Regions:
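Phosphate-binding active sites in nucleotide-utilizing proteins
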Residues: 1
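C-terminal regions of RecA-like/P-loop NTPase motor modules
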Residues: 4-36, 45-66, 78-79, 90-94, ...
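Active-site flanking residues adjacent to catalytic metal/cofactor-binding acidic residues
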Residues: 66-67, 102
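Residues immediately C-terminal
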Residues: 71-74
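Short, conserved SAM-binding segment of the class I
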Residues: 87
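Conserved H-loop
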Residues: 96, 100-103
Length: 200
């Protein structure tokens, strides 16, 4: 179910049974962390496949995050990249979720008639690498930030947009995050700004 009201969303995640589910997601029945970090940037796609299978079989991993997947594809042929994506699809069929963090192609800076920089919205065509990765995704989410903005608030804001979501069909703007440099904390931007206004 889609919860659009932020207060309702917070109330939902604070329910005792949801807190218990979050703990269950984070820890196994012995209180051990469920997360395993694998740093395999220099390995071949074949060695990464083997490591992923090890994570699934040895550690019973149900969620694999590849960040960034673009690094794995450097110096690989299109055929090798496509083969790796097919491998990921077989893993998904076994009940494992895959999150591929994908860098974007750097587009040219565009300006309007007055010379002001135009920040354009991203599309699935902006994802760097093999197009099968984007086409195969169950949900494609873009996170963008205007690092060159003159306003510090805008410079530290990241906008989230759902470009595709197979299970719900809901797409579009999904919210913004604000990174506060003073506290080194990431906030929901709307909540942070509301809190700032109420402090004055």
């Amino acid at each position: 179910a889609l919860i659009e009201d932020p207060k309702e969303a917070v109330a939902f995640v604070k329910q005792p049974h949801i807190i218990e589910k979050r703990k269950e997601l984070r820890e196994n029945e012995y209180g051990e962390e469920r997360y395993v970090l694998l740093d395999e940037r220099s390995g071949s796609l074949e060695s990464v496949k083997n490591q992923i299978l090890k994570l699934i079989k040895k550690y019973d991993c149900k969620l694999i995050v590849i960040d960034p997947v673009n690094d794995l594809f450097e110096s690989c042929s299109l055929e090798q990249q496509t083969g790796f994506i097919k491998f990921l699809k077989t893993v998904i069929k076994d009940g494992v979720s895959i999150f591929n963090v994908c860098h974007l192609t750097k587009g040219k800076t565009q300006t309007d008639r007055d010379g002001n920089r135009i920040v354009r919205r991203l599309t699935e065509d902006d994802f760097s690498g093999v197009s099968n990765l984007v086409k195969s995704g169950g949900c494609n989410i873009a996170a963008t930030r205007d690092k060159l903005a003159e306003d510090e608030t805008e410079q530290n804001s990241t906008d989230i947009e759902v470009l595709k979501c197979r299970w719900s069909g809901n797409t579009g703007y999904a919210g913004s995050w604000y990174y506060d440099n003073l506290t080194h904390t990431l906030y929901d931007k709307e909540d942070f700004m509301e809190k700032q206004r109420s402090n004055f």
